[in-house]
């Protein structure tokens, strides 16, 4: 483990420690999540998902950043993806139980608000199935397209305002995936 790794771990500990040490700060965090879920999703995904990408880069290349990677553009994109994820979680957590009830599985919506029961487990399974078969493929495709666009723009913040050449990127990804098979 290198000094940079220890510094990264130290920064994470310093960032998270106050939430474990102060009940008031943690309560304020929970209240903020409840009253501003989409703003908090933007911030949390912008920070945590970008940290995950930086860790992935460290594992792959041995560095936390490199020319063309674009930490800031990744953070902005992840922030907006986080808002989209939060909106989909809200939509699916209400919509899927309603659809399940329209198919005759009575009580799913109420079960989702209570303690763990077999019906709540079924509801959670249906929500997960719906999310993973409808939202996830579109999400992962868009995520790959935005990553490619950031890379194609040299990791610059200009990637955030330049039009994304969707067709070209999709064709590039499709042909490179076909070549891997």
Regions found by a protein language model. Give the residues of each.
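Membrane-interface interhelical connector segments
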Residues: 95-121, 153-161
């Amino acid at each position: 483990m290198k000094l940079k790794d220890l510094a990264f771990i130290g920064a994470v500990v310093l960032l998270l420690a106050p939430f474990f040490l102060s009940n008031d700060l943690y309560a304020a965090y929970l209240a903020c999540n409840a009253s501003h879920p989409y703003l908090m999703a933007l911030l949390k995904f912008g920070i945590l998902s970008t940290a995950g990408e930086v860790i992935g880069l460290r594992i792959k290349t041995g560095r936390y950043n490199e020319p063309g990677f674009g930490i800031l553009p990744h953070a902005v994109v992840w922030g907006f993806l986080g808002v989209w994820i939060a909106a989909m979680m809200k939509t699916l957590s209400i919509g899927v139980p309603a659809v399940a009830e329209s198919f005759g599985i009575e009580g799913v919506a109420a079960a989702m608000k209570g303690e763990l029961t077999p019906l709540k487990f079924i509801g959670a399974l249906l929500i997960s199935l719906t999310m993973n078969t409808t939202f996830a493929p579109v999400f992962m495709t868009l995520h790959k397209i935005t990553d490619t666009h950031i890379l194609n723009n040299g990791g610059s913040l200009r990637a955030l305002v330049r039009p994304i050449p969707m067709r070209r990127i999709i064709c590039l990804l499709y042909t490179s995936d076909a070549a891997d098979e």
